[in-house]
């Protein structure tokens, strides 16, 4: 393998397929990981996936990926709109990072319109369903070339 991508999913994303399927669809977190892993394999890359409902675990994963991964795909969930600490961890990781949202936050409640993470992201993908993860992996693979 030519490198590893860190795939991070934040709070409540373990509930994909069950929580608000009218917004997030019926695909599960396992479907997301399988899709990202398959796309990465096409580029000779691996995926290391972590979902956590705890901000500190996501921060630790970013710190640990510094210098060992080629990039990060992150769906921070609700932390998108609140976490300066997660933004700082993305910056500290020095990884090219693609922010993904299954739904389009800009078409939802006002408080979802601001993203701290996007300040450090090389790209933001929103509203493409779980296909956004595939697009994100492809972006990172092409940045690596």
From Swiss-Prot:
The keyword Amino-acid biosynthesis applies. It catalyses: 3-dehydroquinate = 3-dehydroshikimate + H2O. Pathway: Metabolic intermediate biosynthesis; chorismate biosynthesis; chorismate from D-erythrose 4-phosphate and phosphoenolpyruvate: step 3/7. The keyword Electron transport does not apply. It comes from the Bacteria. One of its GO terms (molecular function) is 3-dehydroquinate dehydratase activity. Homododecamer. NCBIfam families: aroQ, PRK05395.1-2, PRK05395.1-3, PRK05395.1-4. This is 3-dehydroquinate dehydratase. It comes from Corynebacterium glutamicum (strain R). The lineage of its organism: Bacteria, Bacillati, Actinomycetota, Actinomycetes, Mycobacteriales.
């Amino acid at each position: 393998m030519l490198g590893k991508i860190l795939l991070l999913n934040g709070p409540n994303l373990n509930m994909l397929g069950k929580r608000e399927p009218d917004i997030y669809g019926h695909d599960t977190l396992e479907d997301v990981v399988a899709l990202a892993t398959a796309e990465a394999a096409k580029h000779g890359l691996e995926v290391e996936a972590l979902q956590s409902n705890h901000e500190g675990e996501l921060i630790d994963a970013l710190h640990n990926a510094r210098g060992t991964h080629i990039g990060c795909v992150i769906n921070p969930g609700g932390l998108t709109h609140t976490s300066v600490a997660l933004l700082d961890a993305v910056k500290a990781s020095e990884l090219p990072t693609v922010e993904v949202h299954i739904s389009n936050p800009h078409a939802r409640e006002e408080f979802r319109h601001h993203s701290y993470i996007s300040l450090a992201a090389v790209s933001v993908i929103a509203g493409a369903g779980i296909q956004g993860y595939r697009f994100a992996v492809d972006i990172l693979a092409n940045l690596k070339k």
